[in-house]
Design a protein with these regions (language model features):
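Glycine- and acidic
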Residues: 15-18, 65-73, 91-100, 124-130, ...
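Beta-strand segments within the central parallel beta-sheet cores of soluble alpha/beta enzyme folds
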Residues: 125-135, 156-162, 212-222, 249-252, ...
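A structural-propensity feature for long, helix-poor, extended segments
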Residues: 221-222, 228, 603-624, 629
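Cofactor-binding active-site loop characterized by glycine-rich and histidine/acidic residues
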Residues: 62-63, 68-80, 84-96, 101-243, ...
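Thiamine diphosphate
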Residues: 6, 162-185, 191, 205-216, ...
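N-terminal amphipathic, basic-rich helices that act as targeting or association modules
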Residues: 1-149, 414, 486-502, 506, ...
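Generic, well-ordered alpha-helical scaffold segments in large soluble proteins
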Residues: 15, 19, 34-38, 79-86, ...
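Non-catalytic terminal/interface segments that mediate subunit docking, oligomerization
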Residues: 58, 62-84, 105, 120-123, ...
Length: 882
């Protein structure tokens, strides 16, 4: 765009500069906004840029001054760098397959060091403590610092990634493996950022509801620029902006590289991220250039240096740091004679030392200081660094991420660059270096952390205990529904409605729904509990005149997440780990379409287990034939199998309201009173039927996973044992009647709320017996239940056959027939679907007769008679294939 009147242009610029000098940024911002509004009303389309020039956001004149001892901190930071590198290399000398990462921490050491020295607040009596999501691949640096602090021994460093024998260090942040050290698992790319957002949001929730004091704690999330391509990394940033989460700080290590090559070789990742975050209403703080560039910026009166910085793409910037100062002079400054003139007095070595912002402690401190003091917005810090910084041959190379070994020449260069006191003769031994106790370095480390409340990272393992109301509180569920038909989903809603009335536990219950509350019949809670909103309710809801109107409230208890399963699960994790992060045990209930649970957010569910989260996941509208009208994408037949892959997840598929009540009460007791590091997955259905009263003595069997529901004590020549769960148990009950009435065969009916728990018990017993060959073998719970029973065993569920197949090895009878809903779902009536998937009462009878025929107890023709009697088509297509 050509400047047609330079004099007028300068007058406008001088006027703006005068306003900035005399009246400040706010006034200048106001005037520019008004001018933009005027132009817009006049129909003028003004140029609009959501990004700023490729330079630091904070000008030199506005930088907060770092108060500490720069030279001492560089000394300590260098030792941390060395020990991190030595730890990874020594582990790979022991076993080359152990792996490890050097380059990520090498690029981010300064980013962490400034945080540890000045910003990461540890929990104290006066301060709840900051929550820090460390970038997973940078864990060696965190261990190395903890070693200097005396928290981790040299033996532990030696055992990096060697955990089986004990006293080792986990590869990445894993609370399950190091429960007093790591707070959050982060190395599955993208899960750290989305969890950090919802931890910050849940912190505001706890503040609004009076559980924790307001405004003290921060959530820090460290991540890489390549990680930002994960949908979870950026998918929830609009929520953070909308909720004005000024307790949240993202620090993105922009070393411009991912595993295979550049993040945006043909563009600029920092500029791209600036636009994305600024558009989501974040405070964006770019830290691109270090302080050695400041004199050159001061000379850049015509803007040519800035223009050159703006036009160079990331692939070229990576090249500059993979080469040397002469290359930078030729290819960066050599683009214009004026730029070459600007650096004519600088040697190639001095040009090489022109540093990037993420390696400059002064620039990083200024950015962090601005972030913690910024109000009304979350902050993202985009810090430009060099991958593999200081590692010599691996620095800024495409192979940097996979570097686990450094040659002797590079080690020597690393030692010299960072002034490590290791002799040439000892270099290949890679000795750890730790200053003596009482040294200046040790004192400085201790003083910096003491000023911030103690060492980090640290994780609280136990919290205050909260009593859980007795089972009798849920008496209405235990006594049955009389003649009224209700679903287990409705029973669940009634259980929660009762529990929230308890003075101790009630306020700590956190109902979480992804825009499906009305589907599950929970809209009555809108008015009762309120929906959490950081601003309350600024409008009059359209249904205000109704009893169950949509009520938003700053102190609302329900988290209504919208159509957002990953966000809802992240909220659940935040609530489920609140006992550790805030010493406030909360009990979250996240209810969702069971098909859109583990199948959709399985990685987050795995992270929940690693995080030792407590709470209930409720798979609503479960069962492949029970949610009959929704079809293939909605009908769940495998969520229990997916849940079974998480070791500390307890899963149940109850049929009746009393089973559900017993399970929820016992789970609450285990997680809230005993603080066991487990969580529960329970499926509930939308099929209405009469809910019976609980049989006497059923509680123990419900929790263990199996109990005798109906015993056929009548005389019969032949007998079978029928197992079922969920709504299909009712088909099993009907099958028992058909066997008796149509064939004179007796049948005991067993309710099996959890085949997964039966498998867990069986495996534990099997292992014990293997390890104690000289002692009397123990029996699994399945064997205890079925050991003295007559006849073959038949199981039918609304899930894949593999679900009930899990217990086959402990079933005493050789004849164990399993029915299940393998195959794609489809829409139709429940009756037709259950026949299609071969799990209804007639198919249960058929399987029972087949098992008896296999034993020789009855003739095969009886099976054929049943096929004809019930109109079963022998040539029917296999549901697995159609």
């Amino acid at each position: 765009m050509q400047d047609l009147d330079p004099v007028e242009t300068q007058e406008w610029l001088d006027a703006l500069e005068s306003v900035l000098d005399r009246e400040g940024e706010d006034r200048a911002h106001y005037l520019m906004t008004r001018m933009g509004e005027l132009a817009s009303r006049s129909g003028t389309q003004l140029p609009y840029a959501i990004t700023t020039p490729y330079r630091n956001t904070i000008p030199v004149t506005h930088e907060a001054r770092m108060p500490g001892d720069l030279f001492m901190e560089r000394r300590i930071r260098s030792l941390v760098r060395w020990n991190a590198l030595a730890m990874v290399m020594r582990a790979n000398k022991h076993d080359p397959d152990l792996g490890g990462h050097i380059s990520t921490f090498a690029s981010s050491a300064t980013l962490y060091d400034i945080g540890f020295n000045y910003f990461f607040q540890a929990p104290t009596d006066e301060h709840g403590g900051d929550l820090v999501f460390f970038q997973g691949h940078a864990s060696p640096g965190v261990y190395a610092r903890a070693f200097l602090e005396g928290r981790i021994s040299e033996e532990q460093l030696e055992n990096f990634r060697q955990e089986v024998d004990g006293n080792g260090l986990s590869s990445y942040p894993h609370p399950w493996l190091m429960p007093d050290f790591w707070q959050f698992p982060t190395v599955s790319m993208g899960l750290g950022p989305i969890q950090a957002i919802y931890q910050a949001r849940f912190m505001k929730y706890l503040e609004s509801r009076g559980f924790i004091p307001a405004g003290k704690q921060k959530v820090w999330c460290f991540m890489g620029d390549g990680e930002c391509d994960e949908p979870e990394s950026l998918g929830a940033i609009s929520l953070a902006g909308r909720e004005k989460l000024d307790n949240l700080i993202f620090v993105i290590n922009c070393n411009l590289q991912r595993l295979d090559g550049p993040v945006r070789g043909n563009a600029k990742i920092i500029q791209e991220l600036e636009g994305v975050f600024r558009g989501a209403e974040w405070n964006v703080n770019k830290v691109i250039w270090g302080r050695f560039w400041d004199p050159l910026f001061a000379k850049d009166t015509d803007g040519l240096l800035q223009q050159r910085m703006d036009e160079v793409i990331d692939g070229e910037y990576q090249n500059y740091k993979a080469k040397d100062g002469a290359y930078v002079r030729e290819h960066f400054f050599g683009a214009r004679p004026e730029l070459l003139e600007m650096v004519k007095d600088l040697s190639d070595e001095e040009i090489w030392k022109l540093n990037r912002g993420g390696h400059d402690p002064y620039k990083v401190y200024a950015a962090y200081h601005q972030a913690v003091n910024h109000k009304g917005q979350p902050t993202v810090i985009l810090a430009k660094t060099i991958k593999g910084y200081g590692t010599g041959s691996g620095e800024a190379k495409n192979i940097a991420h996979n570097v686990k070994k450094v040659d002797v020449d590079s080690l020597r260069a690393f030692r010299d660059k960072f002034d490590i006191p290791v002799k040439d003769a000892d270099l290949e031994k890679l000795p750890f270096y730790k200053p003596e106790e009482g040294s200046a370095e040790a004192k400085y480390l201790a003083e910096r952390r003491a000023a911030l409340g103690g060492f980090m990272p640290v994780r609280r393992q136990k919290s205050m205990s909260v009593p859980v109301p007795p089972l009798e509180t849920l008496k209405a569920m235990l006594d049955g529904s009389g003649d009224r038909e209700i679903s287990t989903t409705m029973a669940f809603v009634r259980i929660i409605s009762q529990l929230v009335k308890d003075k101790e536990l009630g306020p700590r219950i956190v109902p979480i729904v992804p825009d499906e509350a009305r589907t599950f019949g929970m809209e009555g809670m809108f008015r009762q509990l309120g929906i959490y909103s950081s601003v309350g309710q600024l409008y009059e809801p359209v249904d205000k005149d109704q009893v169950m109107f949509y009520r938003e409230d700053k102190k609302g208890q329900i988290l209504e997440e919208g159509i957002n399963e990953a966000g809802a699960m992240s909220s659940w994790i935040a609530a489920g780990t609140s006992y550790s992060t805030h010493n406030q045990p909360m009990l979250p209930f996240y209810i969702f379409y069971s098909m859109f649970g583990f199948q959709r957010i399985g990685d987050l569910a795995w992270a929940a287990g690693d995080s030792r989260a407590h709470g209930f996941l409720i798979g609503g509208t479960a069962g492949r034939t029970t949610l009959n009208g929704e079809g293939l994408q909605h009908e769940d037949g495998h969520s229990h199998l997916l849940a079974s892959t998480i070791p500390n997840c307890r899963t149940y598929d109850p049929t009746y309201a009393y089973e559900l009540a017993v399970i929820i009460r016992e789970g609450s007791r285990q997680m809230i009173e005993e603080q066991q590091d487990i969580f529960y997955y329970i499926t509930v259905m939308n099929e209405n039927y009469v809910q019976p009263a609980m049989p006497k003595g059923a509680e123990e069997g419900i929790i263990k996973g199996m109990y005798l529901l109906e015993e056929d004590k009548k005389e019969a020549a032949h007998h079978v044992q029928l197992l079922g769960s969920g709504t299909i148990l009712r088909e099993v009950e009907e099958a028992a009647k058909l066997l008796r009435n149509d064939f004179g065969i007796g049948a005991d009916v067993w309710s099996v709320p959890s085949f997964n728990e039966l498998r867990r018990d069986g495996l534990a017993v099997e292992r014990w017996n293997r390890l104690h060959p000289g002692q009397k073998p123990k029996q699994s719970y399945v064997e205890e239940c079925l050991g003295g029973r007559r006849g073959p065993v038949i199981a039918s569920t609304d899930y894949m056959k593999l679900y009930a197949e899990q217990i086959r090895q402990w079933v005493p009878s050789k004849e164990y027939k399993v029915l299940g809903t393998d195959g794609f779902g489809r829409s139709d009536s429940r009756k037709k679907l259950r026949n299609f998937f071969e799990v209804d009462r007639h198919w249960v009878v058929l399987a029972a007769l087949e098992a008896l025929a296999d034993r020789g107890d009855i003739e095969p023709k009886v099976v054929a008679e049943a096929i004809a009697k019930y109109g079963i088509d022998p040539e029917k297509r296999n549901p697995l294939d159609c």
